[in-house]
Regions:
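Polyanion/phosphate-binding surface patch
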Residues: 10-39
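Short internal beta-strands
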Residues: 117-121, 300
Length: 343
């Protein structure tokens, strides 16, 4: 079973300074405590658990938590408190343990009693491709930014600028097409493999699918997922809820971090973002509350960053479009359910 982990609100800043690359953001709130030590308001729970878990060889320790962390907000550019509930499995993590954690993630989403979807991926497929194409280390960060943004045109241009040929650039942009139902996308991805690292990643995903069985029905595979590559090294997964524009669940394997504290140990876990889930109880946008004939809200967005910022604010209020207006050549994008249209 899982044992509850109770974290202190503060940690010595040295912990976050040493493991900064594993944090979602390098900015933390620090203060000098009464004993003269520099401390920080906790920006992460997993680091604290990994530091203290210390599983013995062959042992698997399991924890769950319900905690608050403090992180910078990209929208408000201020620090905000984030309420998380999650679990961690540390030590001897095998395929069965990995499948058990993913099954718990699926069950957590199902308990919300609203339409949800879990997307999975594997960092080994992406890093294997980058290595197989001999992508220069200094070019990878820029390429990954365009991959995260699902921007095929800029990704191809950046690949060519990095010295890759047309075939290699096409292999990178082809990642954006490897998205869909888990089984069908696995078959499609096998045909695109260039190295053993990619094949091994797909085999691990196949084992996961087999282990989940009917519990995994509806699971999606997105091999272009490139978030937090410094943190995750194998399986990654993200949960979404209808009506909420951002992910409500994130998790995956973080063996490299775990091995910094306990050599030879592996780890997997996930967190649910309870603040995001509060949107489910929020009032619907006015256009969704109206009965009878639909009334559309037409919005003309300004160009550039101001338009991007305006769209993010509106999407956060429940007025997102079914297509990202930045990723399409269409002059008009809309969301019929929310009765909103962007020009």
């Amino acid at each position: 079973g899982y044992r509850k982990y109770r974290a202190s609100r503060f940690e010595e800043y040295a912990l976050y300074q040493e493991y900064q690359r594993f944090l979602p953001d390098s900015q933390v709130i620090t203060f000098t405590d009464l004993d003269g030590k520099l401390r920080a308001i906790k920006p992460d729970v997993t680091l604290s658990i990994a530091k203290t878990a210390q599983p013995a060889a062959g042992e698997c320790k399991r924890f769950y938590y319900n905690e608050e962390v403090c992180r910078p907000s990209r929208e408000s550019h201020t620090f905000q408190t984030i309420h998380q509930m999650g679990l961690e499995s540390m030590g001897a993590v095998d395929a069965d343990e990995q499948a058990a954690v993913v099954r718990l993630a699926l069950q957590s989403l199902a308990a919300l009693d609203v339409p949800t979807v879990l997307e999975v991926s594997h960092m080994g497929y992406l890093t294997g491709l980058l290595d197989a194409l001999s992508v220069p280390a200094e070019a990878r960060a820029r390429l990954l930014d365009f991959l995260r943004a699902k921007n095929a045109h800029e990704l191809r241009t950046a690949a060519l600028d990095a010295g890759l040929d047309d075939t290699a650039a096409a292999a990178l942009t082809g990642l954006l097409d490897l998205h869909g139902p888990l089984g069908a996308t696995l078959t499609k991805a096998r045909a695109a493999c260039l190295c053993d690292a990619q094949r091994n990643a797909l085999e691990e995903l196949q084992v996961l699918q087999n282990a989940l069985g009917e519990d995994g029905r509806g699971t999606q595979l997105d091999l272009s997922m490139a978030d937090e590559m410094e943190y995750y090294n194998g399986l990654v997964f993200t949960g979404y809820v209808a009506g909420i524009p951002r992910a409500v669940l994130k998790g995956g394997r973080y063996d490299y971090l775990m091995q910094r504290f306990t050599p030879g140990a592996n780890a997997i876990g996930f967190a649910m973002y309870l603040d995001e889930l509060e949107r489910l109880a929020a009032p619907l946008p006015p256009v969704q509350q109206q009965g009878g004939e639909k009334t559309w809200l037409n919005i003309a967005l300004p160009k550039g960053r101001l338009g991007d910022k305006a769209y993010k604010l509106l999407a956060g209020a429940g007025y997102s479009a079914t297509e990202d207006y930045n990723d399409t050549r269409k002059l008009v994008v809309e969301n019929p359910d929310a009765c909103v249209r962007y020009f």
